């Protein structure tokens, strides 16, 4: 049984305490106040219930209505302090009854009981109120840590994770941590204090009865552990199914156009219903098991009360070691200790669910940050000479075979300052991967990428990326105003600087014609704009940042002719005096590049100007002729 209890009760509790050690320290002040108020609440509760004994003795005329006692001096040799205190309390009550009558004494004791209860409930409220900042603060901190971790992880991490799964962890899993683990904070900080004080009180009343009661606690705990043993495993499965549900919603929102184009609504509805039903079936099993906590603890608590009442009755009726009012007080205190024990039983169900969610959250929080500054990195504030790829190879690990799949192989390229180099080739030839190595979105496995002769791995990541501006095929905009999107990389930009950037990017006219001008919200991912408008806002953002190095990743490939003309004009203005690396699908957009590099299967197979490559009649000429058809 000891091994079973260790695996079902103590192991989850150990994990729970480890989580609290990670997140509670900033809230020690609130924790201290909560413990203080819990101690006060427990003491006041004991005193309020202790008033029941004289009330019951007066009502049922035990020992003639109240014991007849002589006053004992506190420094006399009368026995224990408990015996002296009890005797003198009854003495004062006895004297009060003689002077004022039993009914008046009953009223005064009742008022004392009500007053102590008022103080107790006030302390109880304050103990719970001081837990709330801890609970809400920890949940906020977890969400902040997840978001900050997402921003710090390399792009490679997200190529292996579904966006919907990450969203599910930040929403559903964090919510489960709040509902399951944080709701158990009361259990940890309040109930042990109550149990300790009530247990000491029970021993003081009758150590024989208390010893008898203790014998029943381990089997009850074992029985509760049997039910909760598999809860964590079921909860992990449920949260994984919730991630599948969220991932499908995210994919549907991103692919609605295709779903409608292929009349696949019914197919997608059926698939979603299957995924959603699987989640419902699993979470139903988890909740049913969880809901067993209260009725089971209620039933076991009643059995304990009945057994104690039977044994206590023997002590009263057969041995006279305890009187009736005192046994009732004992039962009241025992019932008071059962409630905290019930909370422990509920926690034994709730905590495993939260631990399952925390385990999924930690897969993000504890993921290794691959792209980070080395110790004492070199700082750079300007670009002076050249970008160089020196024997660069890049590969990723195939998830099925666990083998390295090379995307780039032995790349050697020098891009002098102020020059424009274009990368062309078929899809999958490694063009986008190559430009992603310059701002160090990924690290190379072999070779070096150098800026002014310094390996990018040796540079501070922030300094490196501040030198680079990006304009991608899909303009990445945020659900904010034109102004906020354009000044995204330069928050201190003036309105005049923002307007000038928009003019250079050919975006000023349509921005000023919008409802609120530069303060107009552009919608989720710029959904209220056309493709060309989104791209020009993206170019304005790059212009405002004013970087010496510019990366264009197929910036005009998805645009119509008119939009392409406007965007191309804006790009030419942006490229002036800048070192530019352009990934191009349409060869017509890179005819004027200083050098064109042709990639095929991860290697540079040709290089030169447009005219030189056409004359070679090689792979570039083949691509050019295909686009002329």
Regions found by a protein language model. Give the residues of each.
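Membrane-integrated ABC transporters
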Residues: 1-50, 59-113, 119, 126-131, ...
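ABC-type nucleotide-binding domain
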Residues: 4-9, 374, 380-629
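Hydrophobic alpha-helical transmembrane segments of ABC transporter permease domains
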Residues: 36, 123, 127, 171-216, ...
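Transmembrane alpha-helical core residues of multi-pass small-molecule transporters
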Residues: 37, 41, 116, 186, ...
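Juxtamembrane helix-loop junctions of ABC transporter transmembrane domains
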Residues: 45-53, 57, 107, 112-163, ...
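Helix-loop-helix
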Residues: 201-215, 224, 289-359, 364-365
């Amino acid at each position: 049984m000891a091994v079973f209890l260790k695996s079902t009760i103590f192991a989850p509790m150990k994990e729970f305490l480890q989580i609290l050690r990670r997140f509670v320290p900033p809230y020690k002040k609130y924790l201290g106040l909560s413990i203080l108020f819990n101690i006060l609440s427990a003491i006041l509760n004991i005193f309020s219930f202790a008033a029941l004994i004289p009330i019951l003795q007066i009502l049922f005329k035990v020992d003639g209505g109240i014991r007849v006692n002589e006053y004992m001096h506190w420094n006399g040799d009368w026995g224990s302090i408990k015996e002296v205190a009890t005797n003198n309390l009854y003495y004062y009550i006895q004297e009060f009854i003689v002077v004022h009558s039993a009914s008046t004494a009953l009223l005064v004791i009742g008022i004392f009981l009500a007053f102590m209860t008022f103080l107790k409930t006030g302390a109880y409220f304050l103990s719970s109120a001081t837990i709330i900042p801890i609970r809400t603060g920890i949940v906020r901190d977890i969400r902040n840590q997840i978001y900050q971790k997402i921003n710090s992880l390399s792009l490679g991490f997200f190529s292996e994770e579904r966006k919907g799964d990450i969203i599910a962890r930040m929403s559903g899993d964090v919510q489960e941590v709040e509902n399951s683990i944080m709701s158990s904070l009361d259990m940890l900080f309040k109930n042990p204090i109550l149990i300790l004080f009530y247990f000491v009180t029970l021993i003081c009343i009758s150590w024989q009865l208390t010893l008898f009661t203790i014998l029943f606690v381990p089997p009850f705990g074992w029985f509760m552990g049997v039910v909760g043993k598999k809860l964590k495993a079921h909860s992990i499965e449920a949260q994984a199914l919730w991630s599948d549900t969220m991932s499908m919603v995210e994919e549907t929102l991103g692919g609605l156009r295709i779903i409608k184009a292929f009349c696949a609504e019914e197919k997608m509805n059926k698939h979603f219903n299957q995924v959603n039903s699987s989640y419902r079936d699993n979470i139903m099993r988890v909740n049913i098991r969880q809901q067993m906590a209260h009725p089971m603890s209620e039933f076991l608590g009643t059995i304990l009360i009945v057994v104690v009442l039977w044994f206590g009755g023997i002590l009263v009726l057969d041995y006279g070691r305890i009187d009736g009012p005192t046994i009732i007080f004992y039962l009241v205190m025992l019932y008071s200790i059962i409630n905290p024990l019930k909370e422990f039983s509920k926690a034994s169900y709730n905590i495993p669910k939260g631990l399952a969610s925390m385990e999924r959250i930690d897969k993000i929080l504890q993921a290794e940050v691959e792209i980070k500054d080395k110790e004492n990195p070199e700082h750079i504030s300007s670009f002076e000479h050249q970008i160089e790829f020196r024997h660069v190879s890049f590969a990723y690990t195939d998830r099925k075979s666990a083998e390295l799949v090379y995307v780039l192989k032995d790349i050697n390229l020098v891009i002098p300052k102020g020059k424009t180099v274009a990368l062309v080739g078929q899809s999958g030839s490694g063009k986008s991967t190559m430009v992603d190595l310059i701002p160090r979105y990924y690290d190379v496995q072999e070779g070096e990428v150098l800026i002014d002769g310094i390996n990018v791995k040796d540079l501070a990541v922030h300094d490196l990326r501040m030198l680079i501006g990006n304009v991608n095929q899909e303009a990445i905009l945020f659900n904010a105003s034109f102004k906020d999107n354009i000044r995204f990389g330069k928050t201190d930009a003036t309105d005049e600087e923002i307007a000038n950037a928009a003019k250079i990017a050919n975006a000023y006219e349509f921005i000023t014609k919008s409802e609120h001008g530069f303060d107009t919200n552009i919608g989720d991912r710029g959904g209220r704009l056309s493709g060309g408008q989104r791209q020009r806002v993206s170019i304005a953002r790059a212009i405002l940042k004013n970087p010496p190095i510019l990366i264009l990743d197929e910036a005009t490939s998805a645009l119509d002719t008119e939009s392409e003309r406007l965007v191309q004009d804006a790009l030419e203005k942006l490229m002036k005096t800048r070192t530019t690396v352009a990934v191009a699908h349409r060869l017509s957009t890179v005819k004027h590049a200083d050098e064109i590099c042709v990639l095929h299967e991860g290697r540079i197979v040709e290089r030169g100007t447009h005219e030189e490559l056409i004359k070679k009649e090689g792979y570039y000429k083949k691509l050019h002729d295909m686009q002329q058809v």
